[in-house]
């Protein structure tokens, strides 16, 4: 593909059979909706858009913001002419049924991170597209069955990250022309970046393997990793994943021992599945710490899942700490700067 090529050109070349035509239509519709959402976010309070509570809660119990509701309305409107069997949204208690014989179903979070709106931080839209099998309940297959996934980042630029199952491409919104243009093709997660993203304030609640990994990073050059690490935490899933795609490192949102946090807080169908598909397509890895996220199946629309994703070596290290606790280097004197061993 050529630098600056529009998203619509890519989708036109991709749409070679009925299923792919439906996928292309869905991606194009979500992209169009995201442009409208981007404009609303950019206007902020000038357009009456704030992070104020709407007065209700979504299906997952989160307090809905004004923009959550507007973003949901925009995405549903954008998808009205797309041939889908069902829609699953963070903002809905139940599936929105379409044509049961349509070739695809779509899961999405219309506005991820809406609590960041009033602080002018990054938010986004996440989506997952799966094949529909007539007679089979939608969204019951493993995440590995996804045929397309992506997310939009509403930041200094509005960017669309997309995989159609053959690598990851990044597009940026040309605001004058109101089209997405290709800026990076076949993105690969950098393999060796000394960065990790986690909410360290929850350290006391984590399982020991997560504590062990983070403690190794904190130990830096004096510890078993033999290098200093930087910690990042934005509190926005789309921003964290975009950074890892472009800079490398690892993102952790594990389960912990707080009530209601045993499986973390991220939702499988419209957060961890699509982000994991994107990450693997970019040469990274995504795990719960014990198993591959894309091997998981959802029992409910809003099922949660831990998420550890990023550079393969770091994800594998965290998995090893879960399966073999003896791999933890807690006897620091042997591994410190002046110790006998380094790993």
UniProtKB/Swiss-Prot annotation:
MF (Gene Ontology): fructose 1,6-bisphosphate 1-phosphatase activity; magnesium ion binding
Pathway(s): Carbohydrate biosynthesis; Calvin cycle
Location(s), subcellular: Cytoplasm
Binding annotation for substrate: 112-115, 199
UniProt entry tagged with the keyword Cytoplasm: yes
Cofactor list: Mg(2+)
GO CC aspect terms: cytosol
Residues that bind Mg(2+) 2: 109, 112, 271
Record keywords: Calvin cycle, Carbohydrate metabolism, Cytoplasm, Hydrolase, Magnesium, Metal-binding
EC number: 3.1.3.11
UniProt similarity note: Belongs to the FBPase class 1 family.
Self-association state and partner proteins as the record states: Homotetramer.
Protein name, UniProt field: Fructose-1,6-bisphosphatase class 1
Organism from which the protein derives: Rhodopseudomonas palustris (strain TIE-1)
Organism phylogeny: Bacteria, Pseudomonadati, Pseudomonadota, Alphaproteobacteria, Hyphomicrobiales
